């Protein structure tokens, strides 16, 4: 069908275009807003033809109003547009959108008051405080709990097996019930007899505590008065249905049904704790677990904790952040202690996914690279050596970048025919002496040792056999003169090692 702009014509269209979008604003409603509303209704699976009449607009308002608190801005804008259009159809004079919303609220309040008055008149005729109702004769009679309620209760116990949500379900189904009705609900539970025995023990303990705090008055009961209920009467074991109704509807009333229900809920809390053995301290977020799933497990376990609301609030503020994984914990601590649960879940959305892992890895690699660069820079700190050109002899550039005419020959000695790396010009060695030396030997060689020469043939002695003593392996002892001569041969090492203490 497409979007339509023919919803309003004539006077209604003029009135529509005079209404401002905001109080004190300059912009007014136009035909394009009706076209947009048509398209948005199709998105919400609503019939756009409902905009043609005031009754249709009222139906749209009833459909959209429950979702306003959790809806998007588009939903709120659509609701405001339909509310304004409803006022135009009803010919209600308004100046802006806020006045239209106020008119809608006034009509809804008036309709609600009429409904309450009609309901109160009907209740005054036939019933008071279900399941105890008043019959036509004005007597208070009991309506048994329905089979549908019992079936819902049994189904919850079988499916949930005393999980934390069983307690609110029991509270809702047992609203206004008598002790007899409550016993009927407990007796319909076929399985979990160990849990039911624990519940009976808790009820007996509470009944004994009631008897201790409310002792029996001495003497007979005055005529026309009801006796005070005992613990067993509240539990429905020693009292009749008529007595229970009389206590609950008396003046002053004794709410035996509510008291008994409170005892049962206390026992159910113990059973829920037994069926949920996991402590709130053990609920920790896994390394790859989404934060939303972790929050669900946390509050499900917190629901089973036997603690006051203040303690549970402290657990939520402290343990929820403390037991999160390192990635979420870093984000939550950055939000601060006053962050709401919605802000936490929004901030941690996507943590643990591929995109988040890639971002974390990139940040880690960036930090490693920065650290490496800083270490490399720190290793080469110190005064910089000035570079010198071998061609022109000036500092600040190298020979390959020199603009001066290239010097011919060796850059060291100035002679042609060889390069500087092959230059044989004398240069100082590590002892500070010029090398090559004209004397032949460097300073760290023996200088005064005579060169060995062969004697003339005329002076050569005839070879004779050595004496027998020379074959003995004896240690030769040098003479003092020979030792002094050897020491004098080492005098040239003074330049290297200083004074020789052996000569002193």
Swiss-Prot record:
Keyword annotations of the record: AIDS, Capsid protein, Host cell membrane, Host cytoplasm, Host endosome, Host membrane, Host nucleus, Host-virus interaction, Lipoprotein, Membrane, Metal-binding, Methylation, Myristate, Phosphoprotein, Repeat, RNA-binding, Viral budding, Viral budding via the host ESCRT complexes, Viral nucleoprotein, Viral release from host cell, Virion, Zinc, Zinc-finger
UniProt organism field: Human immunodeficiency virus type 1 group M subtype C (isolate ETH2220) (HIV-1)
Region Interaction with Gp41, residue ranges: 7-31
Motif Nuclear localization signal: where in chain: 26-32
Location of region: Interaction with membrane phosphatidylinositol 4,5-bisphosphate and RNA: 14-33
Region (Interaction with host AP3D1): 12-19
A GO BP annotation: viral budding via host ESCRT complex
Name this protein carries in UniProt: Gag polyprotein
Gene symbol of the encoding locus: gag
Site (Cleavage): 130-131, 361-362, 374-375, 429-430, 445-446
GO terms assigned for molecular function: RNA binding; structural molecule activity; zinc ion binding
Record-stated family: Belongs to the primate lentivirus group gag polyprotein family.
Domain notes: Late-budding domains (L domains) are short sequence motifs essential for viral particle budding. They recruit proteins of the host ESCRT machinery (Endosomal Sorting Complex Required for Transport) or ESCRT-associated proteins. p6-gag contains two L domains: a PTAP/PSAP motif, which interacts with the UEV domain of TSG101 and a LYPX(n)L motif which interacts with PDCD6IP/AIP1.
Key word Zinc present: yes
